[in-house]
């Protein structure tokens, strides 16, 4: 399970994941663990420093920039730009030869071609579609990059598919079908299959056919 926001409080015990991996310490990503966790929790040192108050027994440090294996799945924490107070990472997740990049809150992605190169799917920030929520503070980008900017990153890195999650109120309260059509169109303009992620969706990373 990646992230456990406050709306998952208590429900996480019913889900009973085998591991939880955190991107950053904002309430909508980590405060579902206010009553503890039913499994090991992985986070960067910067995130753990902000979560000292949570009664999590099995705390494991996630190194930045180095892949580790969790239950047979490789996770590589990549520093991204989103918040100064709660430094965030995105995760390059690999299973065999297939991989995806997950960053539900992101304003900027340094070294994007290297980070996204070779992935099959980009799963990004759905806070806003076209209106930027990014500004500069202390020399760092903070906030939320629009879907259009993230699609540009994917295009430049040769990523063929993109999904957007953690959607903002304008999307959640809007007409989902029409907005999804718009996202698909924005993707097609860049040669990318794109869409909005919905509750219950499943993403299958099919194995590459053998030669």
Regions found by a protein language model. Give the residues of each.
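Pre-active-site segment of Zn-dependent metallo-hydrolases
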Residues: 1-25, 31, 109-114
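Conserved beta-strand hairpin/beta-sheet module of binuclear metal-dependent hydrolase folds
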Residues: 1-15, 87-104, 121
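Short gly/ser/thr-rich secondary-structure transition/capping motifs
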Residues: 2-5, 57-62, 101-107, 144
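Divalent metal-coordination and catalytic microenvironments
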Residues: 3, 12, 24, 75, ...
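Active-site environment of divalent metal-dependent phosphoester hydrolases
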Residues: 25-31, 48-50, 66, 83-85, ...
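Short internal beta-strands
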Residues: 40-47, 123, 163
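Metallo-beta-lactamase
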Residues: 43-89, 94-97, 197-200, 205-206
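Cap/insert and terminal regions of metallo-dependent hydrolase folds
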Residues: 109-201
């Amino acid at each position: 399970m990646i992230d456990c926001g406050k709306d998952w409080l208590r429900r996480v015990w019913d889900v009973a994941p085998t591991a939880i991996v955190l991107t950053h310490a904002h309430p909508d990503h980590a405060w579902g663990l206010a009553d503890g966790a039913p499994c090991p929790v992985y986070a960067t040192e910067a995130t753990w420093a902000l979560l000292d108050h949570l009664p999590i027994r099995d705390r494991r440090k996630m190194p930045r920039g180095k892949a580790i294996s969790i239950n047979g799945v490789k996770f590589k924490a990549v520093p991204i730009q989103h918040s100064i107070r709660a430094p965030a990472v995105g995760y390059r997740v690999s299973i065999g030869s297939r991989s995806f990049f997950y960053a539900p809150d992101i304003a900027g992605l340094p070294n994007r071609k290297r980070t996204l190169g070779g992935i099959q799917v980009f799963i990004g920030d759905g806070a806003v579609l076209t209106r930027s929520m990014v500004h500069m503070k202390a020399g760092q980008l903070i906030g939320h990059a629009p879907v259009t900017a993230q699609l540009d990153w994917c295009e430049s890195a040769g990523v063929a598919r993109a999904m957007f999650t953690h959607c903002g109120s304008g999307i959640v309260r809007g007409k989902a079908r029409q907005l999804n059509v718009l996202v698909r169109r924005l993707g097609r303009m860049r040669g990318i299959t794109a869409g909005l992620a919905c509750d219950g969706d499943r993403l299958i990373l099919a194995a590459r056919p053998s030669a």
